[in-house]
Amino acid sequence: MNFWDTEPAKPEFDYNVEKKKFIENMDYLSAMSVEEQTLYKKWQEWNSDLATSMKRKASLALHYDALWMPTDIYDKEQTIKEIENLDPYVEIVDDSKESTRWTEIRKLIHTMSFDANPGRNVKIYVKDRVSGKILGLVSLGSDVTSLGVRDTYIGWTQDNKYKDGRLNHTTIATTIVCTQPLGYNFLGGKLVACMATSPEVRKHWKEKYGQTLIAVGTTSLYGIHSQYNGIPHFKTLGESAGKVATKPDDSVYEVWHHWVKEHKAEEYARQTAEKEGVDGPATGVKQKIINMIFKEVGIKASHYQHGFKRGVYFAQMYDNGNEFLRNEITEDQLVMKDKFVDGDEYTMKWWKPKAINRYKKLHEEGRIKPESLFYIDIIGMSWEEAKEKYLNEVGR
């Protein structure tokens, strides 16, 4: 079974009824702001199978104690000392039980819903050695095959990506999230983003996949104004060419997914086929299936896009990394940038002063936000209750 497949029981399919349901769902979602859509998907993530979520709620709540928190965020002297003493490191997740725990924590601390990406997948904790607590999470996956501003920046060709296999030397960070209140008060998101380029990450990538990791890319949901701005590890490349598509609820998607798979088998096979030279299934395949459904029910994808383009960011770790990705030099000719040679030490020298200055400024201005962000109580909430409590937290 493929990652995008599901196995629900197959009810009787009424074409006109299901078409109406699908269009009504898309219209309902498109009437929301991007922030509201984001929260709605989060609410559904925990409430679409409420019985299961309720059974797991007590064990899920235990994850809260694993998260880093300042002892007393209003105690300026003590909090600054705690930041100075932080010793962040990356811990690679390498067994199924820990992978499940990582996913649960990811769903509890991040406003974006979680979808497992196709192909390669590396899940990472960013932890503090002193306390053992979690500072944030990272997931790295198979890079997207086409991304305009990135492709222009690198200057590579289709042959470079697939025939030469260079696309397997880059990755996209599908999750970069820090805990709160570390994020807002101490620029924790910037710290976790930097740690995605850690020497331990590069070492693991080489050991697991047999290829040198040249660069880490990522995107932001809300255009180019994001946590990635101003990080020396990442270059802001611009915005993605297209606006972000609104995705239907799983309940209506699954019904139509199985219908097109059965009744449009030839086109379905073509859309979901692997690309030669790329490790894993076609990236973006779920969106291709959604586009097939749009065509079938007679609606245009362009009518269901929100107003934000994605900001695109790229951590090129070698002075001549783009030349390697264009297949102009061999691996033994690569020259790593000094900041990535220095690794976590460089990151700490850059981040800690900025984190402390950010905290001091917020403290002086009375703008400290002490709240954590942990979505355990969204389980069992109505949609209206979830909006009232959490809508202002989206994008925090």
Residue ranges and their predicted role:
Residues 28-131:
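Low-complexity, highly charged intrinsically disordered N-terminal segments
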Residues 54-57, 62-64, 68-76, 173-175, ...:
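Long, compositionally biased intrinsically disordered regulatory segments in eukaryotic proteins
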Residues 6-24, 33, 95-99, 103-104, ...:
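Acyl-donor binding region in acyl/amide transferases
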Residues 5, 14, 27, 49, ...:
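Acidic-enriched, low-complexity/disordered segments with a strong bias for Aspartate over Glutamate
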Residues 1, 40-43, 65, 99, ...:
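Intrinsically disordered regions, especially transient/low-confidence alpha-helical propensity segments
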Residues 22, 64-71, 75-97, 140, ...:
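Generic preference for hydrophobic/aromatic residues in regular secondary structure cores
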Residues 2-50, 55, 263-396:
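Long, compositionally biased intrinsically disordered regions
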